[in-house]
């Protein structure tokens, strides 16, 4: 193992001892926020320190066995012990490398999911509805909560745009690689000749901003407009100005919300979406800066990238970033995303390990 990695592991082991001492103090719970912070740090450091302890024991075992090589009676035993210790060291080094990978601070957050119809007109809007159902079914399998924040329906029951909030354990970490262009190839219900059409939707997955302090929005930077809500085909049109449009002047980001009959609740929802979009813009700027020095295709999240194709006649779904093709489109559209999500996470981890090797 490289010296830089060993030095980092020594630092983490020392820090765990400090955290243990702080948690053992009689007044440890006097500041409950600090206590929770230390408890989280303890939970993060403990697995690393445990594996590092096993690694150091394997190093000691190797040194002891090597010292026995000069003894003719112990030579065979020592050779077996050396082989065993080296095997353990190799395995533990791999485990420690994964444990040292940088954690995404947003992984444990809830998320805001935006789906927008793109090329393909009404068929694209119908596919946006199919994608919403796919993600909703996946969320239900995880026992997550799904709340529609804003929707703009098309004439045939699809969505020109739909924004939902998904809340649940590590929701963002599971779906963060879904951002990008999703292409569909199928015979539309409106196609009389039976010809296959290609259309596309854009998906954006953004971590939900904290209620307080995560994204600073100055009230003077906001323009707030209210107007009457309008449903598809003129349905459920409110007679009061309950719909809200927020414009963030420094970034030009505009958010509308008209789903609720309460102007106050519409404003609250719009503020959540606005904060998520501002946070997302900041994250993507940081990622673009990082990408200028290292290309990370999986995590780029570029909305213009076509990341996946859903080919209904062939029954296949292909993720172009990792060249993975699965012939179970019906199951995937019904929310069975586990194989895709896990494969993308594994590829991202491999990218991180490669980067760790370059930087060490």
From Swiss-Prot:
Subcellular location: Cytoplasm
Keyword match Protein biosynthesis: yes
InterPro entries reported for this sequence: PCRF, Pep_chain_release_fac_I, Pep_chain_release_fac_I_sf, Prokaryotic/Mito_RF, RF-1
GO CC aspect terms: cytoplasm
Keyword Cytoplasm among UniProt keywords: yes
A molecular function (GO) term: translation release factor activity, codon specific
Alphabetic keyword roster: Cytoplasm, Methylation, Protein biosynthesis
Domain of life where this protein originates: Bacteria
Post-translational changes noted in the entry: Methylated by PrmC. Methylation increases the termination efficiency of RF1.
Primary localisation category: cytoplasm
Role according to the record: Peptide chain release factor 1 directs the termination of translation in response to the peptide chain termination codons UAG and UAA.
NCBIfam families: prfA (TIGR00019), PRK00591.1 (NF001859)
PANTHER family named in the record: LD18447P
Family to which this protein belongs: Belongs to the prokaryotic/mitochondrial release factor family.
Protein name: Peptide chain release factor 1
